[in-house]
Swiss-Prot record:
GO BP terms in the entry: NAD biosynthetic process
HAMAP family, alphabetized: NaMN_adenylyltr
Alphabetic keyword roster: ATP-binding, NAD, Nucleotide-binding, Nucleotidyltransferase, Pyridine nucleotide biosynthesis, Transferase
Pathway: Cofactor biosynthesis; NAD(+) biosynthesis; deamido-NAD(+) from nicotinate D-ribonucleotide: step 1/1
InterPro entries: Cyt_trans-like (IPR004821), NadD/NMNAT (IPR005248), Rossmann-like_a/b/a_fold (IPR014729)
Organism: Bacillus pumilus (strain SAFR-032)
Family listed: Belongs to the NadD family.
Molecular function GO labels: ATP binding; nicotinate-nucleotide adenylyltransferase activity
Substrates-to-products reaction catalysed: nicotinate beta-D-ribonucleotide + ATP + H(+) = deamido-NAD(+) + diphosphate
Function in brief: Catalyzes the reversible adenylation of nicotinate mononucleotide (NaMN) to nicotinic acid adenine dinucleotide (NaAD).
EC number: 2.7.7.18
Domain of life where this protein originates: Bacteria
Enzyme type, top EC level: transferase
Record protein name field: Probable nicotinate-nucleotide adenylyltransferase
């Protein structure tokens, strides 16, 4: 039986903060692997245009290729419609009944858990790991594991803005992702 951390996100683009969080959680919780799951259509993000799904998948591939403990899981890309975590977890548990799954969420999402689609069902299926971040209490009535992740103040939004403003993004995202963004002219104004 493997212990697998599920890390869902738009990854638009994936950055060094994502990799740092995944690596720290894997180490602190004793997970065998982290599966990065790009969202097809995140239900909580409907207000902006994202990079095309195929570009986001290619960027995640580029970001994680050097870490043997990281894997790309396309389960949410295979489905149409909103990407609800409960549907993803149900399907993964059917496909991999021998494995134990953990779902990684940022401290900002811990406070949002009561609003998650079918949260009570989800809590019966999986253990959540809250990644502590400065500025968020991470307070909840739910039973969660917590991981202390070093502060690395970067976001995909910041990176997209810097690219649009033609500012450098060195050290914010993996070089392979930066090359991919430049080759495909993503996020340019």
């Amino acid at each position: 039986m493997k212990k697998i951390g599920l890390f869902g996100g738009t990854f638009d683009p994936p950055h060094n903060g994502h990799l740092l969080m995944a690596n720290e959680v894997r180490f602190q919780v004793g997970l065998d692997e982290i599966w990065f799951i790009p969202n097809h259509k995140p239900p909580h993000k409907t207000d902006r245009k994202r990079a095309d799904s195929r570009h986001r998948v290619k960027m995640v591939e580029a970001a994680i290729e050097s870490n043997p403990h990281f894997r790309l899981e396309l389960i949410e890309m295979e489905r149409e419609g909103p990407s609800y975590t409960v549907d993803t977890v149900e399907l993964l548990k059917k496909r991999h009944p021998e494995d134990e799954f953990f779902f990684m969420i940022g401290a900002d999402m811990v406070e949002y858990l009561p609003k998650w689609h079918r949260i009570d069902d989800l809590l019966q299926m999986i253990t959540f790991i809250g990644m502590k971040r400065p500025g968020y209490t991470g307070s909840t009535t739910y039973s969660l594991l917590f991981a202390d992740v070093p502060a690395f103040d970067v976001s995909s939004t910041l990176i997209r803005q810097r690219i649009m403003q033609e500012k450098p993004v060195d050290y914010l995202l993996p070089k392979a992702v930066e090359r991919y963004i430049k080759e495909h002219h993503l996020y340019e104004s």
